[in-house]
Curated annotation (Swiss-Prot):
Belongs to the bacterial ribosomal protein bS20 family. NCBIfam families: S20 (TIGR00029). GO terms for biological process: translation. This is Small ribosomal subunit protein bS20. One of its GO terms (molecular function) is structural constituent of ribosome. It comes from Novosphingobium aromaticivorans (strain ATCC 700278 / DSM 12444 / CCUG 56034 / CIP 105152 / NBRC 16084 / F199). The keyword Oxidoreductase does not apply. Transmembrane segments: none annotated. Keywords: Ribonucleoprotein, Ribosomal protein, RNA-binding, rRNA-binding. It comes from the Bacteria. The keyword Ribosomal protein applies. InterPro entries: Ribosomal_bS20 (IPR002583), Ribosomal_bS20_sf (IPR036510).
Length: 86
């Protein structure tokens, strides 16, 4: 158990950050899901628009430290390739 005031503060801060990061990650997943839904429907224009909206969200995840840059690069690459192949 945290005995020092600073350790207690870090626990509070970590809980807040975990909630914020979870919300950010959920938002990113939603944008990616929109692209995948459009791809499953076979609608190229909708998929391209959804991808255009998802890319800045993914990049923001890297900037905020929620996702690793290589993970985002891989996701963007795969989604872009799938949209282009429609």
């Amino acid at each position: 158990m945290a005995n020092t005031p600073q350790a207690r503060k870090r626990i509070r801060r970590n809980e807040r950050r975990a909630e914020i990061n979870g919300n950010r990650l959920s938002r990113i997943r939603t944008f990616v899901k929109k692209v995948e839904t459009a791809l499953a429907g076979g609608d190229k224009t909708a998929a391209a628009e959804a991808l255009k909206a998802a890319q800045p969200e993914l990049a923001r995840g890297v900037a905020r430290g929620v996702l690793h840059k290589n993970t985002v690069a891989r996701k963007m690459s795969r989604l872009t390739k799938r949209v282009a192949s429609l």
